[in-house]
Structures are given as C-alpha cells and as structure tokens.
Amino acid sequence: MEILEKEGPAYERRKQRFQSWYESVFKWHPNFMYTPNQVINWTEIKKPMSEWKVGLVSSSGAHLRSQKPFDIVSDEGDWSYREIPVETDPKDIMISDSHYDHSDADLDVNCMFPILTLKELVKDGVISSIPSKFYSFMGFVPVPQDLITQTAPEVAQKLADEKVDVVILTPGCAVCHQTLGIIQNIIEGVGITTIMTTLKPELTEQVHVPRAAYLKYPYGYSAGPANDLNMQKTIVKDVLELIPVIKEPGSIVKMPYRWHGHIE
C-alpha cells in the first residue's frame, strides 16, 4: 500500500499543481470559493467487510432519465441531489454535467456511478448489502455554502437513517473533487465510514478528506474503465478494502492501476 507522503519533493510538486490549478480556475469561474474542511471527521468501522452495508454518493451528475436534469448553466452551480433507487436499470440513468467528458459513461454509467458494481459485490458476498437508494450530485458547486448547510447534511442523515456502514464516493470534474470532499466529511461526521476515489490527489489533499484512493485515470472514469465490469468490481473492492488499513485521517492511497493513454 503506497500512501502519498505529506511532505517532501513529491508533496511539493502536488502542492504546486494545486496552486497552478487554483490560480487558473478563476479564469473560468471567478466566483469559485476554495472551501477546505477545517476539521477532518473520522469514523472507524469494526465490522468485517462481509457485514458492511455500503452506500454510494457521486458528484458525477448522474440522475434518472425521468428526473429533472442538474442545472449546468448557473454560475453558482447546482447543490441539489438526486435519489436513485438501487433497483434502477443502469440504462435508465444519464449524466447532466458539462464540466468533464462523460462520453463513455453515457454508454456505461457504471464507470462513474457504480450501481451495478456494488450489486455484484453483494451477490459475491464481498459486502453484506446496499441501502434502498444511492445519491448523486452535480459536483460543479463553486459556491458551496448551501451544499454545506442544506443538501449534504440531508443526504448524510438519510444514509444514517438506513443504517449504512460505509459510503464510497466518486467524483466528476475538478471542482467536483472539492464538492465531494465536503460531502464526504459531512457524511463521516454522522458516524459513517467513507472513502472517495480521486483522480486529482493534489486537489483532494488540499480539501482535507477523511480517506481517499488515488486512481490514475482521466476524468470520466472514477469507478473504473467503461464496459469492463470485472475490472470495475476489482477496483471498487480494492478501494473498499483500504478502509480498515488506513489509520490516519487525510491519507490518500495510490492504487496500482494505470490508464493506457493520455491524462490531462
């Protein structure tokens, strides 16, 4: 297990990449508010993985085709969320988000919103169960005040009401990494253990999240490659297996998977 160091040359390079991104983001989104978690919430789980009820929260912009799409026009973003029943056919899920390329996810939403993956892990006995609903945000929320005070706490409470043990979170765009880190920390604060996948560890570590798994994939594949359920299952299982071995809040573990192609 390779945990990203919080000091030294590699950390300084990531910090510089974050600073470069932070300076550039205002060219496109002048109202962006950098909003790191001031305190990292931390909940340990004592049960074995085979007894976990695992929930899913994504900032991919996924929603049912029958639901109102997310607002991709507002300068302040859209901090609302959509409830997606777990029995939903993945073909009935679409993505509304103009801030990353989700072309492959439009054909296989499971690479961003791993609804089928988690159901398969229940069948395989890897985890015990899943709740009745999963949750999706459109992660472009440059002004996250209402997310922090309203919608993220609502979702956290709904997960707690269903007695969810663990939540896995998957991001969409760059700003989504901050949005998802905020949501993650709020969920962890109600006593649910969480882990997020990150495609940009330089962003995630500056948001200060409980724990994360760095997947060196491009935007649009935060739960694995498209049209490869076996690899999606392997990745999500491996991410979940990190939870009991990560002991320090704020840790990011580098996963051993590599994308065969260009990554921005």
PLM regions and their residue ranges:
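Metallocofactor- and cofactor-centric catalytic cores in central/energy metabolism, strongly enriched
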Residues: 1-264
